[in-house]
Amino acid sequence: MRKLFAAACAALWSVATLQAQPAELRFRDDGTFRIAQFTDMHLDPSKPRRLAESEKTFARLERVLTSERPDLVVFTGDVVTGAPAEGMWRRLLDAVERHGIPFCVVLGNHDAEQDLARAEIARIVTSYDGSLNRLADNGELADVELTVAGRVSDRPAWAFYCLDSHDYSTIEGIDGYGWFFPGQVEWLRACCTARTEANGGRPLPSLAFFHIALPEYVAAWRNPDNSHIGRAAEDECPGVLNTGMFAAMAATGSVVGTFVGHDHDIDYLVAEKGICLGYGRFSGDNTTYNNLRPGVRMLVLTEGARGFETWIREDDGRMVDHARFDEGKITEISVER
């Protein structure tokens, strides 16, 4: 009965997620897979000064794609936040497409606050050959499950979940940022359960990417017993309601890391109940508030391992907060290089 319920929830949440993955992701010959997370770029052409700052952001994108050579690019929200927005979206995605790198976009709370609605942004994003996004039944970006094949085998070795954490509360009398809907929680649970069954009863290691932090981030960062790295120069602004997404992730045993943005002055990783709760690094420039050096979070997976390596690449080329997450613990490799 539980399996039937989970399957029904998954089907109801988004038919689009049942479609075949549009582009193959595969581990390299050396057994690694590299991900670049760009977050809160806040590209804005609305004024000359903001456009000039956005040019710096485009230059950063180009440098990282050239130097780090990621196998996947994930944009975790608040990508284009000024009008006219379409030209900025196309310029951004054209750049990734020129490098031949697949990408996935999740939206933030500010992406639809200019001259494009969420469905209009979704049509632009999904028009690219390299896009791993799909349209949901409502015309917006669907939550998607992506899999990475092994070097030789076509069987999935890892999975990624790119999820919509929405924008603001939709309940009268409750103010604050958005949260995952119950259907999304059950969809993720169903996906992870199905992958475990297909993997001979062993949970398939996976990462989740979204914009707004889970409520569990707050207590996890403040727990002195949790291993961690990075900094928080502001308080977290998680979704105002807790609908059980973290509990679902922990219960399935599949998700080993979550990566968000939203809070520009936070870039920490903290281990909580076997899951690495992580932030990217603010990847934009002076079109919005920021007090950290702009940068990009890199993630490196190894086929056959449940852990991962990560660092932040800053503008001057420095690698900072180089760490490894394995067996539920964050271990610092180096602070700066």
Enumerate the language-model features and the residues they cover:
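Extended active-site neighborhood of metal-dependent phosphoesterases/phosphodiesterases
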Residues: 23, 90-201, 298-302
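His/acidic metal-ligating clusters that form di-metal
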Residues: 69-71, 159-162, 174-267
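Binuclear metal-dependent phosphoesterase catalytic core
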Residues: 23, 29, 145-154, 245-250, ...
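Active-site-proximal beta-strand elements of phosphoester/diester hydrolases
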Residues: 32-45, 157-167, 209, 275-282
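Metal-dependent catalytic neighborhoods of phosphoester/phosphodiester hydrolases
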Residues: 48-49, 77-95, 112-130, 220, ...
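Bacterial N-terminal signal peptides
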Residues: 6-15
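N-terminal active-site segment of His-dependent metallophosphoesterases
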Residues: 20-91, 95
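Active-site environment of divalent metal-dependent phosphoester hydrolases
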Residues: 44-46, 81-84, 105-116, 168-171, ...
